[in-house]
Swiss-Prot record:
Protein name: DNA repair protein RecO
Task performed by this protein: Involved in DNA repair and RecF pathway recombination.
Source domain of life: Bacteria
One annotated Gene Ontology cellular component of this protein: bacterial nucleoid
Database matches in Pfam families: RecO_C, RecO_N
PANTHER family per UniProt: DNA REPAIR PROTEIN RECO
Gene coding for it: recO
Length: 244
């Protein structure tokens, strides 16, 4: 049996049995954990409000034989309560935590991804994260997962994308027009879109115009769904609240 404390962000939480919950956490030092919170649905004192998605916690963990993880207690560090009052901010936060949950494997430490997600949620809560910030977050999260799309050169031949570039999720990003014949699922994209995404990938924070931002969101949605094997549920929720 091993006991330890760690910093954590709640990625998801589901009911289990009559009184318990299973909580998926992204921890700073131990990576993604799915922990059993006994009596969480009945105890108003022990886990009061702590197990909701995108809560920032200090968690008390017990790991037993067979890799069973038990959540023994929590201390709320940040609830991001201002963000929880705005439906559009809730939608972005839920998307961010779902993306991180799907991009990570259990028990693989991801301190950089933890810091990235915590920083994004903090900026959302302070209303400092504009619409383009979500694209920047996605690109950084994909980079941490080793799934960085290619925007600066053709994913097939390595040459310049050219004046009539295309994008193909199966081949990892941009393809030039000649290679587009082989990339049957590729779609034509504006040069300005690839340039804008490449700038975000390199750390620029210049906002994209709404029309390019919408195209970029569409490309990344398809790219992520292809590599994960499914569409993220929170994408539909973002659409319902009018987000790109």
């Amino acid at each position: 049996m091993e006991r330890y404390d760690d910093d954590a962000l709640v990625l998801s939480s589901v009911d289990y049995g009559e009184s318990d919950r299973l909580v998926t956490l992204l921890t700073r030092e131990h990576g993604k954990l799915t922990a059993f919170a006994a009596g969480a649905r009945k105890s108003k004192r022990r886990f009061a409000g702590a197990l909701e998605p995108f809560m920032r916690l200090r968690v008390h963990i017990v790991e037993t034989r067979g890799s069973t993880v038990r959540l023994d207690g929590t201390d709320i560090v940040a609830g991001f309560y201002a963000a929880r009052e705005d439906l559009s901010l809730i939608a972005r936060a839920l998307y961010a935590v779902e993306l991180c949950r799907e991009l990570t494997r259990d028990h693989e430490p991801q301190p950089e991804l933890f810091a990235l997600l915590e920083s994004y949620l903090t900026r959302l809560d302070a209303k400092e994260a504009g619409p383009t910030s979500l694209l920047a977050f996605e690109l950084s999260a994909l980079a941490h997962a080793g799934l960085m799309p290619r925007f600066d050169s053709c994913s097939l031949c390595g040459g310049a994308p050219g004046e009539r570039p295309r994008f193909d999720q199966a081949h990892g990003g941009a393809v030039c027009e000649p290679c587009g014949v082989r990339a049957r699922e590729s779609v034509a994209v504006p040069v300005a879109l690839l340039s804008g995404l490449r700038a975000l990938q390199e750390g620029a924070r210049t906002p994209l115009p709404p029309e390019l931002r919408a195209r970029a969101r569409g490309l990344l949605n398809v790219f992520i769904a292809h590599h994960l094997g499914r569409r993220l549920k929170s994408v539909d929720f973002m659409a319902q609240v009018g987000l790109d």
